[in-house]
Amino acid sequence: MGQKVHPHGLRVGVIKGWDAKWYANKKDFADNLVEDNQIRKFVKKELFSAGISKIEIERAAKRVKLNIYTAKPGVVIGKGGSGIESLKKKLTNYISGKNILINIVEVKSVEAEAQLMAENIAAQLEKRISFRRAMKQTMQRAMRHGIKGVKTSCSGRLGGAEIARTEHYHEGTIPLQTLRADIDYGFAEANTTYGKIGVKVWVYKGEVLPTKKVEKEEANA
């Protein structure tokens, strides 16, 4: 089942954390969940040019904190913090009666972030660049940044073909069923003249958890 399940969801509680860090009772849970979804969609659309790889949402009683992971923090912050203030004002349409805090986290290795890689391939497909060339170039750039493996997939009417199909390419290793393997996953859609093309990217960055046996041996030594 490691082939089918979302790599992040499979590893939550093992080596990955939640992107929504809050607790709510039954009465408020659904409202908060819908609000989170609206916030993510809006921020992604508003700051698409900034290369947003992930948005974490933390909630307290009357406070909502957004941790925005971006490749271009300057674009989000703006001159003298004007970008953040503008974003806060627009977010009041989705978050009412709560104090909004925004924390910007810079993504260091853009070429090794699965979500940004998927969006990059999708953008190239929209510019009518060959899907094979877009996938292979993106993978080669990622491998040069010291990752262990990368796999890409494009689904749809590739090259304007009559029948939709899926093509995969991979370099290195992608141990999807190994829970201690740090696998990043990204998905994007390209709107072409022939219809939508789905782009998926898996990036293997190495193992996270050491074996418990080794830890015990070191403790006893």
Curated annotation (Swiss-Prot):
Annotated keywords: Ribonucleoprotein, Ribosomal protein, RNA-binding, rRNA-binding
Biological process annotations from GO: translation
One term of GO molecular function: structural constituent of ribosome
Domain of life of the source: Bacteria
All copies of domain KH type-2, residue ranges: 39-108
UniProt family annotation: Belongs to the universal ribosomal protein uS3 family.
Record text on subunit structure and interactions: Part of the 30S ribosomal subunit. Forms a tight complex with proteins S10 and S14.
Role according to the record: Binds the lower part of the 30S subunit head. Binds mRNA in the 70S ribosome, positioning it for translation.
Name by which UniProt lists this protein: Small ribosomal subunit protein uS3
Species name: Clostridium botulinum (strain Eklund 17B / Type B)
